[in-house]
Amino acid sequence: MKMKKPTSSAQKPALAKPAKDFARVFAALKEILEPYEKHLHVLPYKPEFYCLVTRLAAHKGKPVWFAAIRMGKNYVSYHFMPVYMNPAMQKHIPPELKKRMQGKACFNFSEVDPALFRQLAHLTAAGFESYRVLKYI
C-alpha cells in the first residue's frame, strides 16, 4: 500500500513566472518605425508581424525590406535590413544594443528598455538615410 507524503504547511506552491508583456514591447518598437510609414509601404500580414518595405521595386524588381517586427514565443524581434545591407553600420551599434543582436540584422527584446530603444531609433534613422543615399527611397 502506497502512503501519501504528508504535506507541510511550510511548503509553498510554486509561483508561476509572470507573463512577459510582449504586446507592450511590440508597440514600443512599432513606434520607432511609424514615422517612416509615409515614405515606405506597410506589408499587411498578421497582428503580431509588422513590416516596412520600399515603395519602389529597387532590387531585382522587388521592394527592399527596411524593417520588420515579429512577436515570438520568447521575445520580440526587430529585423533591420539596412544593417545587413551595409555592414559598416554595425561598427556604429552601441555595445549595449549589440548584445541584443542575433545574426547580422536582428535585435531581440523581452521587455521595454527606453535607453536601448532610443539607440535603436538612432540606428533606424541612420539606416533610413542610407536607403535614401542608395535611392531605395
Predicted regions, residues:
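Charge-dense, helix-prone N-terminal extensions
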Residues: 1-137
